[in-house]
């Protein structure tokens, strides 16, 4: 603490201005409690010439402070003396009262590095190899995007994934290791965190029953030490060795303990007395008062005199406890930064410091009085609701327990063992003195009590006694409860399932069903719960209490009472075995509903939900309720064999809802009921919700189990199969599929492409908990899997659309549409042999639709039909659905996007047509599939290749992977294609119309395929074809790559890459770029870590810092030093050249730069011409190093020697992207702890490079050939020096073994070294950052990592980055779509959906008497977006308005606009459209079509009048487009065949549409101009109401 007297000094006499400055600045910063008037008194006191009267004010204050301190010491000395005397004399007596102290929680840390050092956590994360003891590691870098690496096998085989989800969600800074600490449980893990400063932290938790003492904490150190050894072992080759801390170097952040004790002679604690007694020892503890828990005023029996709860203290003898000062500082903090009023501020202060609100108001007023002018820290203050957490001072010490057998002392927050022991000793003495004083009532202790009581009263008046009010309330709010037990009480809000808050809700004053929630046993014991090892006759330990209640559940009435036993249920919060939650019910809170039990409904995790009931479920006569209770507390296992159990009366028809009990009937939703019943004239008679009769039959929803396997449960209920039966049938069918025809056909090949192998798909079916419709439906429906002829499953899916309009309430509309699972299998629906299942999907629930018949009103017998078959009867349900199903299966893409290939057929359709011909040679024999397992060609018996669109395979045709064996010549192929087109009456669009060429020459083409009228390619034997012949035959030509060859090369991987010029140049560029970086890396090591290098470093720094020589001379001197330290021959040559040049131009200041440069080049011609001949001139344009080349010479001195030709080599450096990394098992990269304080790289000490060695690199001949294409760039840069033998050294292309020195050196060509030295010289002189890296100044160093976003991949491991665009897909494969964990609580995810909704809400659909008007986002491909909106409206005539309009801005609109734009660009580039282009070119600026295409392809802004784009779209989509002005007058008309038929600028007459009224495809767009520009400022989509 700075002393103000010493700071100012004797006789300090400032003037008025200096005084004001001191008061405003100095005192406010260092002595804020000194008032301005007090400062004047201090100055008088320091002035020796001041009068005694002036000095007296400060002297009196000093005397007062001294007396206060002296009296405080006297007050504190007495209780401390009593404690110390008792400690010395009665140790045996007070120690025997207490049992062993057990640890419940502890947070421990240790430091692995010296102060000032850093760890590169990237290295540790990248090198860490996972195994069963370390299955998961997470790295949170400073950029805030967590990277998780996990053992894939472990997670896939682990069925209980809730704990794994938490691993992903919790993202601490640094690296977090999950370490297995128990062999008894697969889920017993400890999280160990490592930060970049070398601090390692971990937390351990135990239960009291584990009986772990402080000494047992030492045993956990071994897990940390083993982890450090593993890190060091994986980096041993590089000498990376983190310190393994000794046991005494592990420090506690906090320790929580629990200790039992017993009072002698059957005495019991009166907590009121103990609380009062603890006040007397105010130097040690402060009392925490809990008003809610204090004793009531009315006392009846002796038992009632004992407090029902405990004594709560805060241990004060800790550093910085000063509670009074902290309160003051906290109030000032709030006043400066937050909006507040006195009530809210006092409420917050009372909570944080555990004082009453009255005391808090007093403190606030005192602060105002002391600091009347507190300035606000900002203009806009924060809200008081969003304040940071505040930890109360002191260490919590709680004495709890109602009965003498359950007294416990809990200590929370001790900082170390010594402090813990001091607290335990004091509390032991306090309890001993309490017993002596209040229980035994010893006379000498009574005198001590009286004295302490008097001193305490004095101390209280002097504010030395803290009385703390505990405002911590028990967990009661729903939000708090659900936050603690998310597994049971919360689930993602779905329409299909009620939340726990609704299922177990309070209603009125007499129905309180929500239970109480507790997190520790002590809170239960306060309520009187005791441990009982048996539950009835079952050995099952639990807590229970006995109370007397009347028939209304009241304990305080005069009615007859009976004893009841109330139990608490203990449920695990996770699978760690450490964390539990307790639920209880009682008459005090719940009235009659005093028994804890469980609801029948479960949440998505399958966990039963606790609730309070009037009757005890354990003794219920209903076996189902009793078994539910026993299952939920873990006494009996779930019976998975229960299938489709019917609950309740089936004939009671439930209303349409999202939740239907198993086996019950419910009405279909309104529109489905109309579609399936009213439209088929089905009738039913219902009375009081009971089904009386239905002679026609009536379709209802059928309830099934929906807590897990929802889709399979729905299907199984129809087929009377259990989940296990279904799984076995699915697995069996795949196992028998030897040729993988079935597997390849599923979802048209998408299943095989997604899972890769059948084994992965089988694993998914047999182990995944979330088996849903998209991935299973095709397999279930396939013939021979479940049913001999196959199944059809039709799903009616609900879609909710929220309609929002300005100034109106939002409307919610439900729509049901038929899901089209596979548009290629539409005809399967009308196969009379197939059985059809109807299912309605609402939210995530699947419910079968069944037909119920009941002809006799007097009986309960009903006929239920669960599956249906097709026939041509119009009243047949399948026939009724089919026409709608067929329409719904029309591909949206084909409706909205016009392409020439849209008329082509898939493999199944083509196969059907070929078989129908009845000609054997045209019957398909094989089918060729591509890399995505889509069928591309059918090969007939005659070997004819028939193209099909990429589609699902034909199940009974064998698969091949290439058509090369069936290629025919051009003439033969053309003939059979023409013949087959005629035979099929042009159903197959395979008539030849052109050719695809592989290569184009001057007068000919190399033809590789024939182009059909469907623009498909039919491969042929390659041949040359002249341009003249192609023109004569009127054939279209198009260059097209061979997709089959591309797919084949991709599947082969890197081994199939053909090394051409491009591959060679890219590989060479990559090699040379990395060679230069490695040169800098080794140069930096030599300069900073060797004796000889250190000498050169001093020379370099002297040259750089010299101000006596100019920049050109500094560069020459630097080059001289660099050549001397690298190669003697080059150094000699360099000096000779400098000498010759100086002689040649010596004294001639005006010699031209050009003549000097020419002279230099001529002097080097004879020495360097062999080098030049070996250089590949093709590499110079892309070379990352600037090799300066002339026809016959190469410069050893760069051109900047001549000032007129200075060239910054750094600017010519090409920093190419890393194209290829070595992802295989690499040499473990270097973990680089970096000592920023000493400029020394710790790992460098272990590099086996002699300190006095002068040779640090070797030079290879320039003629040496390097295999560039085989070069693999490693992400981890390594010193060549670490290779200890010749074999290891020569593996690296950048290293060479020196036999004479027995050392591995960095290897470089002479020509490269010259340029490297030139470039390093530039960096040292002109680039301070790069120079600092080489010279290792401060925190700078040459990076030994190429890319920090690239990690080493290992078999069986997977890396997930939070920034990955496929993050949700990856996590859904692990946890299911319903349970995707929130990485970092979704801190890094941007929700686009909300943005789209907000944009559309702000720009709603408007309407006039004849138009609906939708404005379109401007300057964002607006013309194409407007066309997308209007065309979408046009092709969806039967949808309602809200569904037809795709809005102001949406993802679908973006996709369509991009496609339309690409089609327009493509149309403009096609030669056959030149005639039309000429007609519309006047609407293109300067008639420059090429410039227009370029600008259109690169810009999203509105860059034209929009007429050209719309005209082309009109042609492509055969649509008339009317362009209207702001007043709905037609200003342009665009016709699909005639082009621009009306332009208001060129026509004097107003447009009339009589001529085009019969045209059906018409769309309207409106242009609005806000200036004189020819380009529209705003564009709207117009929808006519007449067609609605």
Swiss-Prot record:
Q: Where in the cell is it found?
A: Virion
Q: What lineage, starting at the top, does this entry show? A: Viruses, Varidnaviria, Bamfordvirae, Nucleocytoviricota, Megaviricetes
> Per its record, how is this protein called by name?
Uncharacterized protein R327
Kindly state which keywords UniProt assigns to this record, in alphabetical order: Virion
Name where it mostly resides: virion
Q: Which organism is it from?
A: Acanthamoeba polyphaga mimivirus
- Low complexity bias: start-end ranges: 1150-1169
Here the segments flagged for biased composition (Basic and acidic residues) are 486-495
Record's Gene Ontology CC terms?
A: virion component
Q: Where is this region: Disordered?
A: 486-515, 1146-1176
Which residues fall in a compositionally biased region of kind Polar residues? 498-507
């Amino acid at each position: 603490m700075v002393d103000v007297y010493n700071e100012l000094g004797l006789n300090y006499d400032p003037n008025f201005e200096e005084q004001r400055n001191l008061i405003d600045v100095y005192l406010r910063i260092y002595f804020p409690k000194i008032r301005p008037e007090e400062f004047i008194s201090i100055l008088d006191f320091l002035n020796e010439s001041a009068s005694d009267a002036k000095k007296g004010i400060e002297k009196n204050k000093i005397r007062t402070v001294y007396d206060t301190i002296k009296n405080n010491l006297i007050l504190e000395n007495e209780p401390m003396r009593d404690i110390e005397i008792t400690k010395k004399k009665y140790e045996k007596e007070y120690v025997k009262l207490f049992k062993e102290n057990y640890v419940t929680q502890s947070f421990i840390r240790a430091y692995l590095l010296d102060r000032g050092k850093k760890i590169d956590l990237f290295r540790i994360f990248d090198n860490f190899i996972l195994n069963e003891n370390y299955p998961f590691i997470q790295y949170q870098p400073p950029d805030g995007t967590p990277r998780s690496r996990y053992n894939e096998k472990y997670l896939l085989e682990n069925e209980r994934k809730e704990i794994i989800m938490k691993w992903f969600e919790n993202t601490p800074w640094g690296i977090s290791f999950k370490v297995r600490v128990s062999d008894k449980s697969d889920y017993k893990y400890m999280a160990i965190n490592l930060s970049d400063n070398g601090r390692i932290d971990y937390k351990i938790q135990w239960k009291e029953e584990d009986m772990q003492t402080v000494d047992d904490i030492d045993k956990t150190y071994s897990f940390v030490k083993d982890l450090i050894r593993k890190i060091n072992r994986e980096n041993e080759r590089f000498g990376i060795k983190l310190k393994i801390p000794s046991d005494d170097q592990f420090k506690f952040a906090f320790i929580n303990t629990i200790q039992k004790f017993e009072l002698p002679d059957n005495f019991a604690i009166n907590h009121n007395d103990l609380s009062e007694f603890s006040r007397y020892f105010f130097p040690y503890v402060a009392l925490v008062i809990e008003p809610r828990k204090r004793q009531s005023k009315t006392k009846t029996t002796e038992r009632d005199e004992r407090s029902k709860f405990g004594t709560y203290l805060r241990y004060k003898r800790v550093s910085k406890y000063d509670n009074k000062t902290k309160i003051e500082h906290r109030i000032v903090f709030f006043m400066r930064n937050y909006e507040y009023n006195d009530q809210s501020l006092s409420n917050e202060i009372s909570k944080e410091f555990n004082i009453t609100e009255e005391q808090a108001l007093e403190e606030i007023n005192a602060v105002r009085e002391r600091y009347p002018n507190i300035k606000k820290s900002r203009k806009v203050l924060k809200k008081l609701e969003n304040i940071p957490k505040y930890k109360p001072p002191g260490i919590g010490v709680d004495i709890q327990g109602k009965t003498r057998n359950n007294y416990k002392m809990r200590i929370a927050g001790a900082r170390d063992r010594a402090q813990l022991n001091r607290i335990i000793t004091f509390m032991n003495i306090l309890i001993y003195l309490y017993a002596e004083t209040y229980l035994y009532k010893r006379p000498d202790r009574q005198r001590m009590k009286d004295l302490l009581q008097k001193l305490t009263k004095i101390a209280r008046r002097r504010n030395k006694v803290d009385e703390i009010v505990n405002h911590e309330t028990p967990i009661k709010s729903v939000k708090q409860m659900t936050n603690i037990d998310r597994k049971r009480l919360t689930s993602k809000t779905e329409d299909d399932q009620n939340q726990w808050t609704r299922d177990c809700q309070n209603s009125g004053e007499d129905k309180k069903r929500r239970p109480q929630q507790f997190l520790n046993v002590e809170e239960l014991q306060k309520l009187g719960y005791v441990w009982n090892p048996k539950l009835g006759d079952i050995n099952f330990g639990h807590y229970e209490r006995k109370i007397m209640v009347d028939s209304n559940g009241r304990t305080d009435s005069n009615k007859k009472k009976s004893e009841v036993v109330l139990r608490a249920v203990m449920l695990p919060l996770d699978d760690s075995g450490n964390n539990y939650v307790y639920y209880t019910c009682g008459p005090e809170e719940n009235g009659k509903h005093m028994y804890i039990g469980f609801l029948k409904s479960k949440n998505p995790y399958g966990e039963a939900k606790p609730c309070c009931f009037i009757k005890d479920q354990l003794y219920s006569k209903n076996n189902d309720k009793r078994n539910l209770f026993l299952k939920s507390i873990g006494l009996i296992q779930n019976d998975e064999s229960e299938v489709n159990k019917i609950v309740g009366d089936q004939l009671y028809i439930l209303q349409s809802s999202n939740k239907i009990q198993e086996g019950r009937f419910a009405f279909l939703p309104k529109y489905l009921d109309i579609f399936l019943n009213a439209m088929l004239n089905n009738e039913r008679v219902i009375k009081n919700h009971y089904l009386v009769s239905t002679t026609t039959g009536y379709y209802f929803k059928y309830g099934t189990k929906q807590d897990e396997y929802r889709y399979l449960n729905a299907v199984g209920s129809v087929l009377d199969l259990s989940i296990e039966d279904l799984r076995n049938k699915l697995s069996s069918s795949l196992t028998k599929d030897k040729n993988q025809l079935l597997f390849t056909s599923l979802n048209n090949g998408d299943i095989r492409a997604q899972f890769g192998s059948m084994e992965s798909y089988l694993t998914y079916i047999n182990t995944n908990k979330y088996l849903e419709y998209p991935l299973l439906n095709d397999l279930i429906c396939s013939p021979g899997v479940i049913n001999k002829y196959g199944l059809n499953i039709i799903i009616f899916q609900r879609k909710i659309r929220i309609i929002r309009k300005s100034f109106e309430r939002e409307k919610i509309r439900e729509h049901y549409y038929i899901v089209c699972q596979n548009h290629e299998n539409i005809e399967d629906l009308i196969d009379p042999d197939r059985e059809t299942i109807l299912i309605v999907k609402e939210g995530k629930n699947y419910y079968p639709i069944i037909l119920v018949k009941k002809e006799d009103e007097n009986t309960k017998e009903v006929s239920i039909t669960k599956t249906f078959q097709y026939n041509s009867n119009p009243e047949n349900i399948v026939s009724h659905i089919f026409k709608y199903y067929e329409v719904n299966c029309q591909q949206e893409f084909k409706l909205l996007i016009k392409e020439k290939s849209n008329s082509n057929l898939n493999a199944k359709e083509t196969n059907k047509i070929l078989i129908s011909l009845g000609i054997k040679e045209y019957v398909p024999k094989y089918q060729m599939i591509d890399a995505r397992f889509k069928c591309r060609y059918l090969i007939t018996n005659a070997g004819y290749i028939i193209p099909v669109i990429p589609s699902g395979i034909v199940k009974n045709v064998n698969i091949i992977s290439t058509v090369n064996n069936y290629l025919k010549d051009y003439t033969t192929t053309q003939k059979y294609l023409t013949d087959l087109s005629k035979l099929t009456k042009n159903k197959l669009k395979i008539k030849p119309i052109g050719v695809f060429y592989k290569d184009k020459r001057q007068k000919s083409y190399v033809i590789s395929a024939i182009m059909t009228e469907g623009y498909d390619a039919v491969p042929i034997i390659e041949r040359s074809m002249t341009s003249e012949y192609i023109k004569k035959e009127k054939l279209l030509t198009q260059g097209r790559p061979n997709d089959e060859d591309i797919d084949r090369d991709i599947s082969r991987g890197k081994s199939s890459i053909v090394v051409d010029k491009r591959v060679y140049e890219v590989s060479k560029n990559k090699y040379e770029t990395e060679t230069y970086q490695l040169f800098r890396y080794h140069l930096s090591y030599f300069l900073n870590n060797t004796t000889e290098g250190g000498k050169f470093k001093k020379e370099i720094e002297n040259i750089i810092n010299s101000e006596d020589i100019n920049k050109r001379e500094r560069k020459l001197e630097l080059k001289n030093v660099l050549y001397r330290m690298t190669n003697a021959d080059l150094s000699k040559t360099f000096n000779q050249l400098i000498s010759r040049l100086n002689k040649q131009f010596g004294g001639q200041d005006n010699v031209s730069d050009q003549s000097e440069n020419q002279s230099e080049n001529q002097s080097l011609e004879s020495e360097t011409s062999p080098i030049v001949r070996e250089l590949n001139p093709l590499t110079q344009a892309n070379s990352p190093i600037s090799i300066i080349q002339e026809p016959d010479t190469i410069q050893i001195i760069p051109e900047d020697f001549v000032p007129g030709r200075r060239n910054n080599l750094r600017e010519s450096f090409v920093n190419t992207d890393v194209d290829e990394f070595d992802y295989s098992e690499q040499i473990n990269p270097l973990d680089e702890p970096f000592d920023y304080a000493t400029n020394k790289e710790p790992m460098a000490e272990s590099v086996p490079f002699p300190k006095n060695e002068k040779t640090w690199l070797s030079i290879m001949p320039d003629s040496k050939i390097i295999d560039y294409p085989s070069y693999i760039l490693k992400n981890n840069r390594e010193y060549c020096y670490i290779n200890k033998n010749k074999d290891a050294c020569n593996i690296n292309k950048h290293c060479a073994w020196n036999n004479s020195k027995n050392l591995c050196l960095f290897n470089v060509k002479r020509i490269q070294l010259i340029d490297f030295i030139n470039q390093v010289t530039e960096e040292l002189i002109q680039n301070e950052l790069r120079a600092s890296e080489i010279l290792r100044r401060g925190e700078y160093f040459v990076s030994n990592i190429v890319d920090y976003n690239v990690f080493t991949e290992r078999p069986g491991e997977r890396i997930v980055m939070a920034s990955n665009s496929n993050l949700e897909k990856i996590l859904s494969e692990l946890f299911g779509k319903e349970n995707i964990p929130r990485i970092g609580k979704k801190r890094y995810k941007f929700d686009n959906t909300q943005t789209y909704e907000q944009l559309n809400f702000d720009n709603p659909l408007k309407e006039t008497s004849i138009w609906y008007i939708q404005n379109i986002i401007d300057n964002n491909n607006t013309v194409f977006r407007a066309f997308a909106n209007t065309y979408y409206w046009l092709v969806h005539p039967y949808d309602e308005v809200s569904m037809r309009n795709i809005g102001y801005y949406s993802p679908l609109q973006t996709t369509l606009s991009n496609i339309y734009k690409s089609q327009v660009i493509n149309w403009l580039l096609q030669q056959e459209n030149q005639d039309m282009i000429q007609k519309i070119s006047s609407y293109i600026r300067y008639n420059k079509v090429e410039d227009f295409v370029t600008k259109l392809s690169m810009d999203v802004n509105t860059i034209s009048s929009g007429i050209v784009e719309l005209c082309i779209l009109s042609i492509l989509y055969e649509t008339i487009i009317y362009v209207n002005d702001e007043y709905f007058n037609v200003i342009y008309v665009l016709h699909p065949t005639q082009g621009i038929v009306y332009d208001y600028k060129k026509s004097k007459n107003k447009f009339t549409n009589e001529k085009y009224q019969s045209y059906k495809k018409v769309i309207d767009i409106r242009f609005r101009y806000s200036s004189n520009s020819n380009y529209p400022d705003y564009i709207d989509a117009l929808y006519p109401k007449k067609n609605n």
